[in-house]
Amino acid sequence: MVSRLSSRLQALASAPCRSLSCAQDVLHRTPLYDFHLAHGGKMVAFAGWSLPVQYRDSHVNSHLHTRQHCSLFDVSHMLQTKIFGCDRVKLMESLVVGDIAELKPNQGTLSLFTNEAGGILDDLIVTSASEGHLYVVSNAGCREKDLTLMQDKVRELQNKGSDVALEVMDNALLALQGPTAAQVLQAGVADDLRKLPFMTSAVMEVFGVSGCRVTRCGYTGEDGVEISVPAAEAVHLAAALLKNPEVKLAGLAARDSLRLEAGLCLYGNDIDEHTTPVEGSLSWTLGKRRRAAMDFPGASVIVPQLKSKAQRRRVGLMCDGAPVRAQSPILSPEGTVIGAVTSGCPSPCLKKNVAMGYVPYEYSRPGTPLLVEVRRKQQPAVVSKMPFVSTNYYILK
């Protein structure tokens, strides 16, 4: 399975918005690069960065450890930006589908950059920081595209007299994910993490490092946090977290299978510029006020799809036989090609093959029997609800 996952990560690296140079010496390095090597990290090229695909543990053991305890991921390759000024919400709402104005202080939301054709340019998390700015985290592979999009809008508003401004952060970003993540982190912070629910954040001192923004979110389906930490303190913080026996380092392979079990999209594979939020089963990201106003890019395409139903839909698949990979054809029970897989892997938790892909709307109901083609052989699949594995986000009741 490890070799199969390594092959899969190489495929992900060549996906749209994830182009890489072939020369290892031109790859970006996170502040934890030497730390990874010292801890046995197997480094690979991903989205223009040198990142660990796994450590000494097998991919499966790392995956299961995250589900049962907690793991530390280096996600410093992600683009972190701050947007300042009285028009910061106006700027962001001119680019995304979400209702940013309704966010409470230190509340965040997953949103989507869209184009005028309704296609998804990237997915991102926007937090309304109580310090008076928006904190934005978006994909490394779309860094230049996202920066151009935001910087062009900044200049447009500034030319009209706005005080809006954008700052690119050089912080590292560490993700501590798993059911014991909060317990581990609580030992190093004074703030009561029981008061920090899913998709909220706070600036706090973490294991002696001041100025860290801790956000209760992640890409695994488990409870956990992402910690934006000054780059010079990243190694100190990672080492402090690893002193707890609950914590192990994890890499890209585990992160990919964890997010797939959780039914989460990978930009460039499962969603892209040719996919609308409705087609991608992401209609929930569309703010109610924004739908009514139809004032976001691509609204004239996206909003009508909410009523008329998009012609195709992203679905989950449970598959028999050999593991299913991206671009594997999806067929009707009669053997007609009707779509394609966008992500797939053996699920370490379910011990079954899981995948997601696009099929015509009439084939999207859970329980619908289909076929997938792997190495020119057809094998059974069934449309399944996502997430495949129940999520465990920390939500206050």
UniProtKB/Swiss-Prot annotation:
One of the GO biological process terms: glycine decarboxylation via glycine cleavage system
InterPro entries, alphabetized: GCS_T, GCST_C, GCV_T_N, GcvT/YgfZ/DmdA, GcvT/YgfZ_C, TrmE/GcvT_dom1
Keyword Transit peptide (UniProt): yes
Catalyzed reaction equations: N(6)-[(R)-S(8)-aminomethyldihydrolipoyl]-L-lysyl-[protein] + (6S)-5,6,7,8-tetrahydrofolate = N(6)-[(R)-dihydrolipoyl]-L-lysyl-[protein] + (6R)-5,10-methylene-5,6,7,8-tetrahydrofolate + NH4(+)
Binding, substrate: 226, 255, 393
GO-annotated cellular components: glycine cleavage complex; mitochondrial inner membrane; mitochondrion
GO terms assigned for molecular function: aminomethyltransferase activity; lipoic acid binding; transaminase activity
Transit peptide: 1-22
Subcellular location field: Mitochondrion
Enzyme Commission code: 2.1.2.10
Organism superkingdom: Eukaryota
Keywords: Aminotransferase, Mitochondrion, Transferase, Transit peptide
Record bears the keyword Aminoacyl-tRNA synthetase: no
Top-level enzyme category: transferase
Described purpose of this protein according to its UniProt entry: The glycine cleavage system catalyzes the degradation of glycine.
NCBIfam families associated with the record: gcvT, PRK00389.1
Subunit note: The glycine cleavage system is composed of four proteins: P, T, L and H.
PANTHER family: AMINOMETHYLTRANSFERASE (PTHR43757), AMINOMETHYLTRANSFERASE, MITOCHONDRIAL (PTHR43757:SF16)
Family assignment from sequence similarity: Belongs to the GcvT family.
Full protein name: Aminomethyltransferase, mitochondrial
Species of origin: Bos taurus (Bovine)
Gene name in the database record: AMT
